[in-house]
From Swiss-Prot:
<comment type="subunit">
    <text>Homotrimer. The subunits circularize to form a toroid; DNA passes through its center. Replication factor C (RFC) is required to load the toroid on the DNA.</text>
</comment>
<comment type="similarity">
    <text>Belongs to the PCNA family.</text>
</comment>
<dbReference type="GO" id="GO:0006272">
    <property type="term" value="P:leading strand elongation"/>
</dbReference>
<dbReference type="InterPro" id="IPR022649">
    <property type="entry name" value="Pr_cel_nuc_antig_C"/>
</dbReference>
<dbReference type="Pfam" id="PF00705">
    <property type="entry name" value="PCNA_N"/>
</dbReference>
<dbReference type="InterPro" id="IPR046938">
    <property type="entry name" value="DNA_clamp_sf"/>
</dbReference>
<dbReference type="Pfam" id="PF02747">
    <property type="entry name" value="PCNA_C"/>
</dbReference>
<dbReference type="GO" id="GO:0003677">
    <property type="term" value="F:DNA binding"/>
</dbReference>
<dbReference type="InterPro" id="IPR022648">
    <property type="entry name" value="Pr_cel_nuc_antig_N"/>
</dbReference>
<comment type="function">
    <text>Sliding clamp subunit that acts as a moving platform for DNA processing. Responsible for tethering the catalytic subunit of DNA polymerase and other proteins to DNA during high-speed replication.</text>
</comment>
<keyword id="KW-0238">DNA-binding</keyword>
<dbReference type="GO" id="GO:0030337">
    <property type="term" value="F:DNA polymerase processivity factor activity"/>
</dbReference>
<protein>
    <recommendedName>
        <fullName>DNA polymerase sliding clamp</fullName>
    </recommendedName>
</protein>
<dbReference type="GO" id="GO:0006275">
    <property type="term" value="P:regulation of DNA replication"/>
</dbReference>
<dbReference type="InterPro" id="IPR000730">
    <property type="entry name" value="Pr_cel_nuc_antig"/>
</dbReference>
<keyword id="KW-0235">DNA replication</keyword>
Length: 248
């Protein structure tokens, strides 16, 4: 079994590991000839992240047979954070079943792999009625504006207009969107849709990935999970699913 993957810089891998760490403590990656993937759900089954990292995104990539390898995310993250922005990161697996991590030219780590306890998690199959495509920086700012007054984000669309809002004990906020606004690429809706989602899950993932993503796509339907797609040039795609808030 031969497996090795080398990045040209550290930012993309840092973004991936940071995003995964917002949901799980242990992660099982799947490596094939096509690339590396990860899919995991938080313990409460509220959020799910699905990552596909194609072989073309790596400076060097080799995998002659499909393998799974599990790591403790906090330990892996500590190693990755030792890399400077321009440092390459190379990972491989030794015959002793250790993860070998080379950071830059002279830092070589060994990390013990863990037994995979992950089960195959199917992706939600949902016909979405509404879509908003906007810049990651604009979305991050909107989340910050809403979090001032609320722990939840409500998204509403109607035709080619939409709004983000939040309400809490201290007050409320509504941020209107128009398709001609700066940072907005598309607002479309087959029918009026509204959904409310937890910022506790949403904020960390957007902050983790947002710096490496240009535009993000939010898709939702009334009372259905939110689906966010991050397109990152050197990663491929990251999909994040978040269950709606259920009013008691």
């Amino acid at each position: 079994m031969t497996f090795g993957a080398k990045t040209s810089g550290s930012d993309d891998l840092k973004a991936i590991i940071s995003a995964i760490s917002t949901l799980v403590e242990e992660a099982t990656f799947v490596a094939t000839a096509e690339g590396i993937s990860f899919r995991g759900m938080d313990p409460s089954h509220v959020a799910l992240i699905d990552i596909s990292w194609p072989n073309s995104a790596f400076e060097k990539y080799e995998c002659d047979s499909d393998i799974k390898f599990g790591v403790r995310i906090d330990e892996f993250s500590k190693l990755i954070k030792r890399a400077d922005k321009k440092d390459s990161i190379e990972i491989s697996i030794s015959e002793q079943n250790m993860l070998l991590v080379t950071v830059g030219k002279n830092k070589k780590y060994k990390m013990r792999l863990i037994e995979s306890s992950a089960t195959d998690t199917p992706l939600p199959k949902i016909p979405y009625d509404s879509k908003i495509i906007l810049s990651s920086s604009k979305f991050d700012k909107i989340l910050g504006d809403v979090q001032v007054v609320s722990d939840y984000l409500t998204i509403h669309t109607s035709d080619s207009k939409g709004d983000f809002s939040g309400k809490g004990d201290s007050g409320e906020v509504v941020i209107d969107l128009d398709k001609d606004d700066e940072g907005i690429e598309e607002i479309s809706s087959k029918e009026d849709s509204v959904g409310t989602y937890s910022l506790e899950y949403l904020n960390p993932v957007v902050k983790a990935v947002g710096t490496t993503a240009g535009f993000i796509t939010c898709e939702f339907s009334s009372a259905k999970p939110l689906r966010i797609e991050f397109k990152v040039a050197n990663i491929g795609r990251i999909h994040f699913y978040l269950a709606p808030r259920v009013e008691s």
